[in-house]
Amino acid sequence: PATRFDLTGKVALVTGGSRGLGREMCLAFAGAGAAVAVASRKLDACTALAEELKASTGVRAAGFASNVGRWGDCDRLVEDVYDAFGTVDVLVNNAGSSPHYPSLAEVSEELFDKVIGLNLKGPFRLAALIGTRMAAGDGGSIINISSVGAVAPVPDALPYSAAKAGLNTLTVGLALAFAPKVRVNAIMPGRFLTDISQGWDPAVLGEAERRIPLQRFGQPPEIVGATLYLASDASSYTTGSVIKVDGGLAPGNG
């Protein structure tokens, strides 16, 4: 029943929440009744979305500035969100980045560390802090947003793919660490048409679409089904899982 997806009375924290897939998740959580903490590096964008959520659904919502690639920022974000909302029932580690580079030999140490920091180190720290509180309290759900690059890496995004593969492994380990009260799962999105994709070459887009079994890129709202499933009681017996939402792009089952 639909009530299995109800999040009334819950608090969800979404990193990278002000745009793209993160924004869609925030909208979905608010629509399901959850209070929403929107976090990203840009406070203005987070606050604007929080105000939109409050106006459209009546839920509590607030924006938080945080660069989750930095350990100290993660610590401050956790304290600020718990101070504002009292708890976190759903953590979505969505913030990520895959900067372009001209060649593998030209990947700088700074770029490599930044990619690992944002896509792997930050999610670990947030999950460690919040998962510990969840396990000591009323439980909760942690959702790591990975990528099909974790299982189908490409040469022009290797640091990103390696970080996301690590995030998949982290998901399984965290599920063991925080069981039985906390469920930890991951979603591997394929290629979605977000604001980031607007600058892509149309010819390249067309060729890429033809390699996807469903013959198209995903629309941002299509991430919502898996997200609500994992956040809610609908997935009460699901933990340590990695779910592809990719139109069939990646091989196998992750």
Spans of model-derived segments:
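Alpha-helical segment proximal to the catalytic Tyr-Lys
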Residues: T132, A175-P180, S236
